[in-house]
Amino acid sequence: MQQTAALPKRLSCDRCYAQKLRCPRPSTNDDASCIRCLRQKVQCVYSTALPKGRPRAAVRACAAGAGATAGAPPITTTTTTAAPSSSDTAPPIFSTEDLASLTGLSTSGWLPDPTWEDSFCFLSSQVVPQPPPLDTTPPPRSLSASGLDNPENCVGRLSDLATRLHAVYQTTRALSDHPLITNAAFEAVTTLFNAPLSPPSAATTAATTNLRETFTSSRHLLETISHLLWATPNNNPSTAPAAAADETVIYHFTIACYSLLLLIYATLLTALHRDALTHTQPSLSTTTTTTGPDNNTSTWCSAPSLVELRLVLLFHMITYFLDRLQQMIRMYTAEFEKQASNSTTGRRPPTSGRWSEEVEEMMVVEEPWEREQHIPPPPPPTSSLGSISELETQARAALMQLRMSLVATRGGLVDN
């Protein structure tokens, strides 16, 4: 003990030395405890100073930091000198237990190397994952509005659309021979949503390609009719006869595309109804776990199969397309007949592309779950839509059959 007392003591106590803080002592008190230890009411311990001839702790930390960073001594120097100045005015942030543990570490002679912070600086830019950059490329548009302003381009687009739909319609008879058309239709929907503009791969079947063309053509026809409804009519008297002829051709091409889509959807819905009857009926070997026949818990609570889930998705998607197509065709027909009556009576057509109040009333279409039947009332005899009302009835009847089969299945996949 006498040899240890003879050695010089460190100017700072162990607590202040471990925290790299100043160690102020009261000048009026004979006690050797520093102000910080007195404030925390802990024992103030002064350890033995380092052997003579070695640099002080601050100088040794600067030299070690300069050797570790190899070329960045200003950063290390700034870090070691700025920390004490900012901590002098800050209140103590360590509890009594933390300070006691730090005191024990300082007494044992183990201190953290101040160069560790500089050695692990590379982790901030290499280990922490950064979010990927945002893709600012706008999504491609399937139809160009500027191209549809020209009647010749619009006729060309509708003619190509009718040609593709006619080719698809010729192959729809094979849908009745397909073993499971639900999977092919769902694959067509998946490829349509993933890459709308990419060509089909070699692995896709002919049925998947044709069904994808059906869904794509439905969307293109909706976009074309929407543009035709909002297009400003031609008010030039000199070009009015030619414009009326172009509008007549465009209208008949639109009705032809709509008729082909109705035929294709009617055949597709019939094939889906066959799949629903084959793959969604509950098994006859299912046992009844309750007393009543209406409370077959094992059948009602069983998980739906993948085919059943795909049928529900296809049912709602086809319902949406049929509702939107019928709604847009009704509005476009009303606007076309209004323009035709104005041209025959000599009245000036409206100067804006907005449709009349009668057409706006047609926009209020009830959802499939809000109406009792899916088959709408037939159009009036004077309307030019009388020729396609039978096709709409066939498509709606096939949709109703598929809906009833999904309602009757286990769990009631579609609300009644």
Swiss-Prot record:
Q: What is the lineage of its organism?
A: Eukaryota, Fungi, Dikarya, Ascomycota, Pezizomycotina
InterPro entries hit by this protein: Zn2-C6_fun-type_DNA-bd_sf (IPR036864), Zn2Cys6_DnaBD (IPR001138)
Q: What does this protein do?
A: Transcription factor that positively regulates the expression of the gene cluster that mediates the biosynthesis of the acyltetronic acid derivatives carlosic acid, agglomerin F and carlosic acid methyl ether.
Give the location in the cell: Membrane; Nucleus
The GO biological-process annotations, alphabetized, read as:
positive regulation of metabolic process
Q: Which SUPFAM superfamilies match?
A: Zn2/Cys6 DNA-binding domain
Name the major location. Answer: membrane
Q: Which residues bind DNA?
A: 13-44
Keywords of this protein's UniProt record, alphabetized? DNA-binding, Membrane, Metal-binding, Nucleus, Transcription, Transcription regulation, Transmembrane, Transmembrane helix, Zinc
Q: What is this protein called?
A: Transcription factor caaR
